[in-house]
Every structure is written in C-alpha cells, then in structure tokens.
Amino acid sequence: MSPRVVEHTSDVAAPIGQVWTRVVSPEGINDEMRPWMTMSMPRGAADLTIDTIELGVPLGRAWIRLFGLLPIDYDHLSIVALEPGRSFHEKSTMFSMKSWQHERSLTPITESMTRVYDRVTFEPRWFMRLSAGLLRRLLAAFFAHRHRRLARHFG
C-alpha cells in the first residue's frame, strides 16, 4: 500500500515568532487537538524543548488519548529535521501506523500574519489498511480542526 497524504494550510493573525512558540509547546499542541484528543510527552522528555532535542533520535512514546482520557494510540516520536522558528519534520511510527510523517512549516505573510502549512504522510499498519480512505478523511478533518483552534487562540 502506498502512503497517503493530507495537507492543510491556513493563515494565523500573529507574528511568526509567537506562532512558533505556540505550535511547538506541549500546551499549544494539546490545545490544537482538544477536545477530541490530547498527547502526552514521552517519559523523560518533559524538560526538553524543540531547541534542545537531538535530531533523528527517538524521544519515546507519546500517548494519544481520546477526549484526554482513554489511550487509543501512541506516537514513537522522532524529529528528523528542524529549522528553528520556521519548520519541523517528525518521522515516527505508531501502533496504528507503519509510517507517520508530520511536516509543519511557518511562513511570514506580514509582520502580524503567519501562514501555517501541515503535510502528513502516513501508511497504516496491516490491520488498518481497509480503513485507509476513512483515516485520510478523518485526518483531513482533524488538521482543519487543529488549524481553527490555533487561529482562534490568536483571535
């Protein structure tokens, strides 16, 4: 099965530095995902920041929780590329995904407006392959939700 791709772009009414700080913080990530899901930080990674992690080295399992309560998946998290203040590329495996890549980039439009671009490339594990089309639609809706939440945060 070939990997599936989901892309989403939106403009956020805030300077790029403020948007970057928000999108790489655990609070910002979880705020984007709520109320549907939350994601824990991997054990031992609580004191790390996007600026202090070692690229390409797995950080450990980040648990994905439905409604913030019920563990439904994990993300064996690894950041493989980083342009501080601009972009990151996560390359991971999950219980449900043989391959998961999340690329997020920020581009300044003006001093007070930032374009946020997400590209998710995923390949479900064998037991999820029949639902790959549904997963793609759910992920597209979920990333649209995340972008709305991020834009709403900056008002």
For each feature predicted by the language model, list its residue ranges.
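Short, linear, compositionally biased motifs with a strong N-terminal bias
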Residues: 154-155
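Generic structural detector for well-ordered beta-strands
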Residues: 9-13, 78, 105-107, 121
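Hydrophobic ligand-binding cavity/cleft-lining segments
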Residues: 1-54
